A protein has these predicted regions:
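N-terminal transmembrane alpha-helices
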Residues: 6-43, 56-71, 75, 79, ...
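Small-residue-rich hydrophobic transmembrane alpha-helices
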Residues: 48-108, 145-164, 271-335, 367-389
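Hydrophobic/aromatic residues in alpha-helical transmembrane segments
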Residues: 35, 72, 113-114, 151, ...
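Transmembrane helical elements of multi-pass membrane transporters/channels
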Residues: 16-35, 137, 148, 171, ...
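Short alpha-helical transmembrane segments in multi-pass integral membrane proteins
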Residues: 1-18, 76-141, 185-240, 297-363, ...
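Short runs within selected transmembrane alpha-helices of multi-pass transporters and secretion channels
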Residues: 69, 137-156, 167-175, 193-206, ...
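Hydrophobic transmembrane alpha-helices of multi-pass small-molecule transporters
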Residues: 60-63, 175-180, 205-209, 280-284, ...
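Helix-terminus/linker motif at the lipid-water interface of multi-pass membrane proteins
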Residues: 30-48, 118-125, 181-188, 250-281, ...
Length: 443
């Protein structure tokens, strides 16, 4: 039976509703992992390092999609909760058109800047050529990639999370099958990986575009709209935390690469790339839960249902806390086989990766609480507070930690810097939740 945003959510009903979003994010991470797995084993560690070096730049330019998706869907869900369906649809249409326009501009910019940015990141020789080549090809699909991120949020708001999951699975399977064909069978190496990524992202972005452009059973259909500068401003403010998360992550990943290159060279970048791929799968559970539950929070906030807000917050904090314990234990158990699958062909790289992941995975214990805390305030249309949490978590604390800890603990200081940043952010998140309880009445 279809679950509606207006219902009271038990644990069972809440997990049923967010499950497609969690699976969607996990699957998105998995096909990214498969991409890296094929490149590492068939194209070599230089090509693998190139992807990890240029990826922060790609993700930085695509951050607009995350901002519009999370910030815009929160506003649209709140508008639905207030009973203004026509206005909600016009806001939706305007945001999609803006994403397309912005994506085209950023795609051109990315293609032009791929080589100079790679040089600035420290690439040279074959590493520079690989970075430039991969970046220029994948920037061709930046617009549909941004659309995919926007539509996945709106699928949940439209009470169609299963359809969003289906689109991601279709895009992911396309990417993985083409990875196998282009890299393993036809020997196209890094070019094959880039083309496979482009094809998968085009499906992920254009299939939802066609769905919402045609007559459908959701509350939304692309159509005529107006220019709503206030809604755009509110979307940017509301989604600023997600924008900050992606931009900051790109900056931090670049800084990690610099530090690792300084301490252990190219092997450090390859090891960090492996850890990040696996990390994406684990934290995808938190991001999927946050994406899936945010429209529920926004709807009940718009409907002024304070009792349900309290119910959602309590259940969500318990869920993310318990998940953190299980994920930490699982990560410790699978560290060795995962490192062997990715980089088992190089003994030194294998040991570096395994050791680094066992330290890094301690962050799973607490990062879910911070991810949900930031998302919760976005859903409450408090983008500034959400952005503050994200800014401190992904930039200030992580940058400080990765610069300071290696002075005392060398390479282990790099691996443990994220844990310190998450612990400091947890204190900030707890203070924000306690301080704002009288405003939102969730306690």
């Amino acid at each position: 039976m279809k679950i509606q945003l207006s219902e009271h959510f038990t644990y069972h009903k809440l997990l049923r509703f967010v499950f497609p979003s969690i699976v969607m994010m996990i699957f998105t991470s998995i096909y990214g992992v498969v991409d890296g797995l094929f490149v590492s084993n068939y194209a070599g560690k230089t090509a693998f390092a190139a992807i990890n070096l240029i990826m922060p730049f790609i993700m930085a330019l695509s951050a607009l999609g995350f901002m519009v998706g999370t910030g815009g869907s929160a506003i649209v869900a709140k508008t639905l909760g207030e009973g203004r369906e026509k206005e909600a649809n016009r806001y939706f249409s305007m945001l999609i058109y803006l994403t397309i326009f912005g994506g085209i501009i950023l795609s051109i910019l990315g293609i032009l800047l791929a080589r100079p940015v790679s040089i600035a990141l420290g690439a040279s020789g074959d590493l520079l050529d690989y970075c430039t080549l991969y970046g220029r090809i994948t920037f061709l699909s930046l617009t549909p990639f941004m659309l995919q991120n926007v539509f996945q949020c709106f699928f949940v708001t439209a009470e169609k999370p299963k359809l969003g999951l289906l689109v991601v699975v279709l895009a992911g399977v396309t990417n993985m099958v083409l990875d196998y064909l282009f890299i393993a069978v036809f020997g196209m190496g890094l070019v094959g990986a880039a083309i496979a990524t482009v094809c998968g992202e085009c499906i992920g972005g254009f299939v939802p575009l066609i769905y919402f452009a045609a007559k459908n059973s959701s509350p939304f259909r692309l159509g005529k709209t107006k220019w709503y500068p206030f809604i755009l401003k509110k979307t940017c403010t509301n989604g600023s935390s997600e924008l900050m998360t992606n931009l900051s992550s790109s900056i931090v990943n670049t800084l990690f690469n610099f530090q690792l290159m300084r301490f252990v060279g190219e092997n450090g970048i390859a090891a960090y790339g492996t850890i990040m791929y696996v990390n994406f799968i684990f934290v995808a559970i938190y991001f999927g839960y946050s994406i899936g539950s945010a429209p529920i929070v926004s709807y009940h906030y718009g409907a002024q249902n304070h009792k349900e807000l309290k119910n959602l917050l309590n259940k969500s904090l318990r869920f993310t806390g318990i998940c953190g314990i299980f994920m930490f234990i699982l990560a410790q158990l699978i560290a060795t086989p995962l490192a062997r699958i990715f980089v088992g062909y190089d003994v030194d790289l294998f040991e570096l990766t395994r050791h680094g992941f066992r330290i890094y995975c301690t962050t799973f214990l607490v990062c879910g609480l911070n991810i949900y805390g930031s998302s919760f305030f976005t859903a409450l249309n408090n983008g500034l507070l959400s952005a503050l949490i994200s800014f401190l978590r992904t930039l200030v604390f992580q940058v400080s930690a990765v610069l300071i800890l290696p002075i005392f603990f060398a390479i282990d200081g790099i691996w443990s810097s994220v844990l310190l940043a998450e612990l400091l952010t947890l204190v900030v998140t707890a203070i924000c939740i306690i301080k704002k309880r009288s405003r939102y009445h969730y306690f």
